[in-house]
Amino acid sequence: MKLNHKTVLALFAVTALAVSLEAALSDQDKQFLAAYGKAHDALVADDLSGAKAAAGDLGTEGAELSKSASLKDARSAFEKLSAKTKQLAAGQPGYHVYHCPMLKKDWVQTSTTTANPYGGRDMVGCGEIQKQH
């Protein structure tokens, strides 16, 4: 198949547009990712009040986390938030999807040092990067 220069330029423009659309995050999405990071850090430290405080910046998605009565409840709510976060972080530089093989749970973080939010201090190092963006 022979492509002329106009076709090649058009394909390049469409590809560039698709990449720029994927990379663009709204201010609301940026706020969500920042709050998710704060909740993550709090759960790593077994800090229920810190996780609940971060939930306020997660919008309606943070309601379950904000009402958590225990770390177990907070981690269950955080797992649901991680599904949305994986979608938001896809294609964003600096975000890494981690997986804990023991608990079979995923989360997103910006650090390349494993910080498992599901096992707290007891399992902080359990997990590995599944996908880097």
Question: What label would you give each PLM region?
Answer:
Residues 2-11:
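Bacterial N-terminal signal peptides that target proteins for export
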Residues 10-18:
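Bacterial N-terminal signal peptides
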Residues 17-133:
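Intrinsically disordered, low-complexity terminal tails/loops enriched in metal-binding residues
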